[in-house]
């Protein structure tokens, strides 16, 4: 009886692996085609929101990446290198946790304030999303672009929630092609 239980658990583990593997392979294939927008929520940063007195120019006043968040960002960059996935440019929110995610994952990036969080003032979300879409519209449609942002921005663009360190891949009409989180 114990042997059967062990075999059953092993089979369940294997069965759980294949859908995740198939999703990863589909994501890689889609990204290699180009023309995708890769929306990445910043890596793990403990807490919610930012203190009332935070300053964009002072990381000590903001939520920052945890040690796991730093490792998560590095794994994200490794995923692109390992799978030979090209992208034209990385854009990041001006918040330190996003800039650090972009830096640890991809080294080079530019900040774009349209990607900044609107968590503290949701009334700003529509204006941020409009500005970001106008910015994206000017980019080469045949290339992949990476945007490291916050859940408010990703939800506003793709109408889907992203966990910390998760990628939401969309086409140029903001239709979600897939989501993926590097382990």
Task: For every predicted segment, state its role.
Residues 152:
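Short beta-strand-plus-loop segments that form exposed binding edges in beta-rich domains
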Residues 37, 145-146:
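Hydrophobic beta-strand anchors of alpha/beta hydrolase catalytic cores
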Residues 23-122, 130, 140, 155, ...:
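Active-site-proximal alpha-helix that buttresses catalytic centers in soluble enzyme cores
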Residues 41, 147-149:
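Short beta-strand segments
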Residues 1-6:
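Positively charged n-region of N-terminal signal peptides that target proteins for export
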Residues 135-137:
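...with weaker cross-activation on analogous glycine-rich loops/strands in unrelated enzymes
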Residues 9-16:
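Bacterial N-terminal signal peptides
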Residues 17-22:
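Sec/Tat signal peptide C-region and signal peptidase I cleavage site
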């Amino acid at each position: 009886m114990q042997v059967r239980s062990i075999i059953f658990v092993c089979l369940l583990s294997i069965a759980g692996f294949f859908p995740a593997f198939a999703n990863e392979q589909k994501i890689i294939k889609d990204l290699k085609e180009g023309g995708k927008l890769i929306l990445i929520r910043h890596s793990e940063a403990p807490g919610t929101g930012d203190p009332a007195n935070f300053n964009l120019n002072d990381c000590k006043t903001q939520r920052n990446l945890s040690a796991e968040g730093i490792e998560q960002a590095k794994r994200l960059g490794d995923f692109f290198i390992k799978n030979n996935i090209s992208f034209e440019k990385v854009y990041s929110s001006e918040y330190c946790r996003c800039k650090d995610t972009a830096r640890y994952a991809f080294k080079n990036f530019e900040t774009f304030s349209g990607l900044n969080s609107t968590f503290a003032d949701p009334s700003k979300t529509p204006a941020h999303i409009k500005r970001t879409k106008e910015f994206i519209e000017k980019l080469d449609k045949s290339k992949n672009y990476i945007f490291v942002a916050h859940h408010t921005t990703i939800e506003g663009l793709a109408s889907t929630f992203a966990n910390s360190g998760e990628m939401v891949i969309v086409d140029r009409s903001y239709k979600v092609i897939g989501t993926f989180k590097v382990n």
